[in-house]
């Protein structure tokens, strides 16, 4: 009770104290509230930033794993494509190698035998060398024969000239022009004239024409009834010496053929002949005798005439692809022809049919 009475006595002052105490505490409360708000905002900021950092770290890890997964997947696709590309390139290279080997074998065996052609060319080269050597020897022999013939011709010409100029030979009384007394020794032509004989001109034989009349066949009038004697040479007649011309030249000059003038040599119908010759040349130069007409409807009804080469039942030979034709149906056995170099028929005749310097070898 005493306490209650004491508290009731103080109740008037408690309100004032409470008011003053609260009025003094309000600024501290506001300050503490602001401090608490600042601390709380700073703490929440740190908490949020830590959480954001955590989220960033987690997102980075997730992105790293995801991107690594996508990278590995893309890398696997790239490796797979590269593997398939490498395998296709390898397959293509192997196929090309097989095709190259097979085509080379096929060409060498069936189309173009390189070793056969090489051996053939080697034999042809050796044969050509042998023939060229033989031809060179033959040419040298011909050249020697030609030189010998030229020397003989020159010798005969000098002999004929010496016989023709035999009248210039020196005598006991008069020296010749080649034996001048002012020279120490005579000219070589003087010795040539001494060795030569004087040239004698033979008279041309007169050919007697045999008549074919009936009277000539009689025994009394026939030329074959009595033997005829040849013309005898003149008796005690000296040979004329002097610079006379050859009888053949004189006869050629005397009986030379007629040389007509241009007016006489040309024919009268020269213009007509020239026109015929020109027409003949134009006809020879003409490629097609048919008249050229447009291609619209003129050649529409013409029947195509195939060439003889295409209309034949035999197929054309593929040149430059094979050296001989193969027909397995005509083979006696299953073996193919042996690739042995055949003999040359032309070269085998060498030394048997050719002549060397007019003598059969």
UniProtKB/Swiss-Prot annotation:
SMART domains documented for this protein: IQ
Can you say where in the cell this protein is located? Cytoplasm
Q: Which Pfam families match?
A: IQ
List the record's Gene Ontology CC terms alphabetically: cytoplasm; spindle pole
Q: Where is the IQ domain?
A: 32-61, 55-84, 91-120
Q: Which InterPro entries match?
A: ASPM, IQ_motif_EF-hand-BS, P-loop_NTPase
Domain of life, source organism:
Eukaryota
GO molecular function (one): calmodulin binding
**An annotated GO BP:** establishment of meiotic spindle localization
Coarse class of the protein's main subcellular location = cytoplasm
User: What does the UniProt keyword field contain?
Assistant: Calmodulin-binding, Cytoplasm, Repeat
Protein name in UniProt: Spermatogenesis-associated protein 17
UniProt organism field: Macaca fascicularis (Crab-eating macaque)
GN (gene name): SPATA17
């Amino acid at each position: 009770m005493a306490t209650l009475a004491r508290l009731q006595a103080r109740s008037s002052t408690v309100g004032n104290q409470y008011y003053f105490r609260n009025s003094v505490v309000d600024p501290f409360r506001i300050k503490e509230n602001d401090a608490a708000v600042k601390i709380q905002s700073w703490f929440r900021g740190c908490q949020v930033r830590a959480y954001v950092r955590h989220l960033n770290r987690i997102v980075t890890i997730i992105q790293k794993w995801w991107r690594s997964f996508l990278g590995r997947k893309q890398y696997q696709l790239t490796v797979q494509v590269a593997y398939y590309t490498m395998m296709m390139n390898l397959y293509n290279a192997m196929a090309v190698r097989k095709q190259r080997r097979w085509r080379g074998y096929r060409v060498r065996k069936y189309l173009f035998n390189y070793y056969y052609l090489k051996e053939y060319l080697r034999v042809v080269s050796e044969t050509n060398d042998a023939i060229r050597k033989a031809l060179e020897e033959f040419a040298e022999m011909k050249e020697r024969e030609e030189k010998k013939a030229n020397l003989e011709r020159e010798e005969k010409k000098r002999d004929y000239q010496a016989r023709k100029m035999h009248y210039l030979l020196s005598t006991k009384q008069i020296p010749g022009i080649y034996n001048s007394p002012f020279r120490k020794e005579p000219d070589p032509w003087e010795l040539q004239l001494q060795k030569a004989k004087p040239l004698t001109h033979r008279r041309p034989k007169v050919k007697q024409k045999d008549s074919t009349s009936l009277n000539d066949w009689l025994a009394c009038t026939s030329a074959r009834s009595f033997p005829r004697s040849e013309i005898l040479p003149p008796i005690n007649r000296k040979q004329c010496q002097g610079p006379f011309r050859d009888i053949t030249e004189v006869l050629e000059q005397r009986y030379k053929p007629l040389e007509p003038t241009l007016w006489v040599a040309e024919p009268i119908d020269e213009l007509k002949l020239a026109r015929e010759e020109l027409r003949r040349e134009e006809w020879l130069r003409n490629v097609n005798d048919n008249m050229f007409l447009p291609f619209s409807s003129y050649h529409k009804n013409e029947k195509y005439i195939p060439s003889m080469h295409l209309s034949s039942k035999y197929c054309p030979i593929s040149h430059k692809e094979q050296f001989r034709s193969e027909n397995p149906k005509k083979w006696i056995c299953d073996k193919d022809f042996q690739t042995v170099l055949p003999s040359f028929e032309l070269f085998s005749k060498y030394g048997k049919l050719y002549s060397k310097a007019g003598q059969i070898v």
